[in-house]
Amino acid sequence: MPPAGIATHAMAAYDTAGRLLPAASGIRLPAYGALLCPCNVFLIGISKMIERFLTQTKFTSVEDFKQNLHFKVPDNFNFAYDVMDAWAMEAPDKLALLWTDDEDNCIRFTFKDIKEQSDRAASYFSSLGIGRGDVVMLILKRRYEFWLSMIALHKLGAVAVPATHMLTTHDIVYRNTSAGVKAIICVGDDYVLEQVAASRKDSPTLKTLVSIGPNVPEGFHDWHKEWNGVPPFERPGLVNDNDDIMLLYFTSGTSGEPKMVAHDFTYPLGHLTTGVFWHNLSEDSIHLTVADTGWGKAAWGKLYGQWFAGAVVFVFEHQKFTAEKIMRKIEQYRITSFCAPPTVYRFMIHEDFSKYDLSSLRYCCTAGEALNPAVYDRFFEFTGIRLMEGFGQTETTMTLGTMPWMTPKPGSMGMPNPQYDIDLVRADGTSCEDGEKGEIVIRTGKGKPLGLFKGYYRDEEKTRQVWHDGLYHTGDVAWRDEDGYYWFEGRIDDVIKSSGYRIGPFEVESALMTHPAVVECAITGVPDDIRGMVVKATVVLGKDWKDKAGDDLVKELQNHVKHETAPYKYPRIIEFVDELPKTISGKIRRVEIRDKDSRKKD
């Protein structure tokens, strides 16, 4: 159901460069049309928007970026008022959000629409008793109500807790009790509604449940039925201080329950570098990031940095991922900027590119795990576009990246984002030399940089474990080359120690990925009485190779790795599987493979 004021009908749609979008059956557009104005109308607005928060807005080199990136942080900064409402005032008819789904339904929101609808949502939430400091969980998949809810909660000074739709009742209860969740706003899917409803009896702080439909069971408020009658929104007096908590993300480690990553109201400012520089966005960009709203990558690629730049956030609500679906949407809606984890690109390069017109693409980025050079090379061969890698965590914004003024080195994460003081350290805390592997840390002796989390909510001990002596420890291992580029090796827990050698999973995975049989692979360590650990490869084969799985192919792949990298790294064990275990954001879960192997041994 479209929000109030949005009609459902078919009409022509245009992108930000004025190009006609392909007609779609049942396309949904604002009743008042709101087709885009010419791009140059917004050039001054974009410059003024970014100039409010940066002392310099254009950079031409690594040194220029390093020396001259400086932020202007307003008191009581609030992204909803200081950016989104400002856009609505200065460029009300500019397209802000373009939402579509598997059936090619399409809803467009201008910045004026976002203001009006988020105001209405804020008034509605306020009528339900939600206010400053209240914790609200959002289980909204890729529904447009997620963006309205986030902006509305910011306007109230409330704390948003984005969550995945795959949570069980146990998961939800844990989150409710750990964070003190007061309200849950969720999709009207039967599974989600059942889990949310069942969590209520064991969640003493949980007072309010809201469904966005179509199903609204007893005990749930009906968003689209109830919010039409709310009074006009009036901005509260003091909504927030800069150090108030704005956002909580639950992030899993290798053991124990998920930790609560707490970000304050300055966190969106940290994503200026993500959207404006790493994604290289401008007012005529239509940007698609492949990420579910329940994970931190949505904040990276579908919200803050993109709207600082005045770009269109493109949202594709799909039931099941396929590379074909994504590529069709890029073609159909003339996407100009694209970001996805390497897993997505691995599947894309196995498609027939001659079937798609991807000529609208100007810029592509990747993050989430290391990019295999073979994938970079094939994607460049097919599109002529260089994949620009980046690195960060739920606890940070973009920490390392390949910027537009840099020459990418396939497989490298790029160089440090100068808003962070990055170093590589040994186990004793001393700095590594070039070429030496160490842990990526952020030095915080001069204060917490923009974008870095406040700590793990309500857990000082876990915070101290990773943040002490003026260093935030990422737990990720890398090395730096003589040009200052960083190269990912793996999580500290992923590094394999075999016969005295330290073997990073990524270097072996990259070697395997150059063999035509391999679509995906994961390298893990398996305990061995003689060597301590041996290297194991879990491999997904291409469809033309599946019937060749056997001892001969195992030997061929082992010899291939010996040829591509140092022979001591070759996988002594190879297992063929149909798919690898992954997080919803596309990261390979090597810990799950290790746990499975451990159970087999027991």
Model regions and ranges:
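AMP-binding/adenylate-forming catalytic domain of the ANL superfamily
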Residues: 212, 563-587
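Conserved AMP-binding/adenylation subdomain of ANL enzymes
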Residues: 269-286, 293-336, 351
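Conserved pre-ATP/AMP-binding loop-to-beta segment of ANL
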Residues: 92-95, 210-221, 228-250, 257, ...
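Gly/Ser/Thr-rich phosphate-binding loop
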Residues: 224-225, 308, 335-340, 349-409, ...
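AMP-binding/adenylate-forming catalytic core of the ANL superfamily
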Residues: 167, 173-175, 184-189, 338, ...
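Conserved AMP-binding/adenylate-forming core of the ANL superfamily
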Residues: 93, 97-151, 168-173, 225, ...
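Conserved AMP-binding A3 loop
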Residues: 107-112, 246-270
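Structural core segment of the AMP-binding/adenylate-forming
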Residues: 32, 40-49, 151, 155-225, ...
